[in-house]
Amino acid sequence: MKDLTERQRKVLLFIEEFIEKNGYPPSVREIARRFRITPRGALLHLIALEKKGYIERKNGKPRALRISKSIRNKIPLIGEIRAGEKREAIEYLEDYIEIPESFLSSGYDHFLLKVKGESMIEEHICDGDLVLVRRQDWAQNGDIVAAMVDGEVTLKKFYQRGDTVELRPANREMSSMFFRAEKVKILGKVVGVFRKL
């Protein structure tokens, strides 16, 4: 995805999210409205995405576009997550990274986050690793999750007892964080870790 402009990346992400939410692609006017540009400007972005192989379009038909088969296993890297104290989420599309299909759970959306910090080292999740997250809003005790509390995101092991949620680090030098269950939003479960050697 390094050949895309920042706006083209955002348009592509919007198309993917729109299709996931609605079951059909956005119209040129909906894209234009979302980015506060003219329909002609939106069309030029679609033409660029098509030329670069990210989407396929049928000229003259409304909503006749789809994500190219060649990028279906490319998962969005949408920023960083702290494996330490909870911090404000950094959510922007950085890139798409191809992931083998065997790592992906059928019927689920996935995204990648870059890990910052050392709170999960005893689970072999280190600073600089990429975690593959299966998007879901629930977790079982012991799952490693990306969780949001008061608008801030952290990577921790999840445990719930009654109406209390414990977000536990996998580092003996760090302490668990405890919250009322309604304050914790699960963004997804970690299902893979990738590291450059």
Curated annotation (Swiss-Prot):
Reaction catalyzed: Hydrolysis of Ala-|-Gly bond in repressor LexA
UniProt xrefs under Pfam families: LexA_DNA_bind, Peptidase_S24
Coiled coil: none
Xref: SUPFAM superfamilies: LexA/Signal peptidase, Winged helix' DNA-binding domain
Cellular component, GO annotation: protein-DNA complex
Molecular function GO labels: DNA-binding transcription repressor activity; sequence-specific DNA binding; serine-type endopeptidase activity
Keyword Repeat: no
Alphabetized UniProt keyword annotations: Autocatalytic cleavage, DNA damage, DNA repair, DNA replication, DNA-binding, Hydrolase, Repressor, SOS response, Transcription, Transcription regulation
Site-annotated residues for Cleavage: 83-84
EC number in record: 3.4.21.88
DNA-binding region of this protein: 28-47
Active site, per annotation: 119 (for autocatalytic cleavage activity), 156 (for autocatalytic cleavage activity)
GO biological-process terms attached to the record: DNA repair; DNA replication; negative regulation of DNA-templated transcription; proteolysis; SOS response
InterPro entries tied to this protein: LexA (IPR006200), LexA-like (IPR039418), LexA/Signal_pep-like_sf (IPR036286), LexA_DNA-bd_dom (IPR006199), LexA_repressor (IPR050077), Peptidase_S24_LexA (IPR006197), Peptidase_S24_S26A/B/C (IPR015927), WH-like_DNA-bd_sf (IPR036388)
The UniProt record lists the keyword DNA damage: yes
EC top class, as a word: hydrolase
Record-stated family: Belongs to the peptidase S24 family.
Additional notes on this entry: No consensus sequence similar to the SOS-box from E.coli or from B.subtilis was found upstream of the lexA gene, suggesting the presence of another target sequence specific for the Thermotogales.
PANTHER family: LEXA REPRESSOR, LEXA REPRESSOR-RELATED
Subunit-level organization: Homodimer.
Function: Represses a number of genes involved in the response to DNA damage (SOS response), including recA and lexA. In the presence of single-stranded DNA, RecA interacts with LexA causing an autocatalytic cleavage which disrupts the DNA-binding part of LexA, leading to derepression of the SOS regulon and eventually DNA repair.
Name assigned to this protein: LexA repressor
Organism: Thermotoga maritima (strain ATCC 43589 / DSM 3109 / JCM 10099 / NBRC 100826 / MSB8)
Name of the encoding gene: lexA
